[in-house]
Amino acid sequence: VLSLVSTVLFAGWVLIGQSTSLVQSDQSDVVPAFVSALAQSPAKPKTLVLSATSSTTTFFISRGNPLSIGDADVATETPPQIEDAVSQLITGSGVSAAKVLGSFGIQYLFLKAPVSPESARAIDGVGGFTRMSATQIGIVWHIVGSSPRVILAGTNGKNYLIPASDIGATGKAVEPGQLVVAEKYDRSWRLISNGVNVPLQHAPSGLPVFSVSSPGKVTLLFDATAHRGLISLQLLTLLIAVVMALPSGRRRRQVPLEELV
């Protein structure tokens, strides 16, 4: 019974997502406050948080808020283009790193302390990164030419910002064009334009795009139903396994002496 109760409590803890849950992260605490504040703007800029030593390099993408179930960063893996750009950036060979990172809506690069002088010099030497600040917690660069999270590339050559939220975006398409989402391609992205579902397309850059044929209201959604369903199925399987492992409820006189000792 104790095992069953523990499993149920564990499942609730994971799904509810408290401050110490497996599906949340307090990674925003290590990002400078002004960068976290900028992440709340309609452009929803992201920050690449980099930790580099002489032997290892780790990174994650921060949106200024803790992660939770349903976020695109949880439901999908990190795009290989970003992994390659980070690898090239550290070695100083990433001439296109800023363009790649910027296309995925990453507007800032934060190198955490302790800062490796070699890594800092490598980033300074690569075009497209403008140093903004250097403090005891690390160094921040702005990525030149980075894209907002959601834009409408109009047919006249202009780009229009579509205000984004933590999950999707809602705004007005002032003219026909392509709505570009600065996220990894995933079939869970949905766009409704003037009440009509718009087919999802996969851009060569790896981004999800939608062709908007007429001006009007557009609503972008990330449908994580399948992802949540998979997690629920995994938890259900775990629960069944624990229940099957519990004592079968046999009478005491039917239990062998070896099991009672």
Which residues fall in each region the model found?
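Extracytoplasmic
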Residues: L2-A75, D166-P176
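Short acidic (Asp/Glu) and glycine-rich catalytic loops that position anionic groups and cofactors
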Residues: V8-S19, T78-Q81, R131-S133, R149-L152
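Alpha-helical scaffolding within the catalytic cores
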Residues: A33-F34, G94-V95, G125-G127
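Extracytoplasmic/lumenal acceptor-recognition loop(s) of multi-pass membrane glycoenzymes
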Residues: L38-Q107, P117, S147, Y185-R187, ...
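Aromatic/acidic, Gly/Pro-rich catalytic loop(s) in extracytoplasmic/lumenal soluble domains
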Residues: I106-Y160, V181
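Active-site-proximal, structured, solvent-exposed surfaces of multi-pass membrane proteins
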Residues: Q136, S147-V261
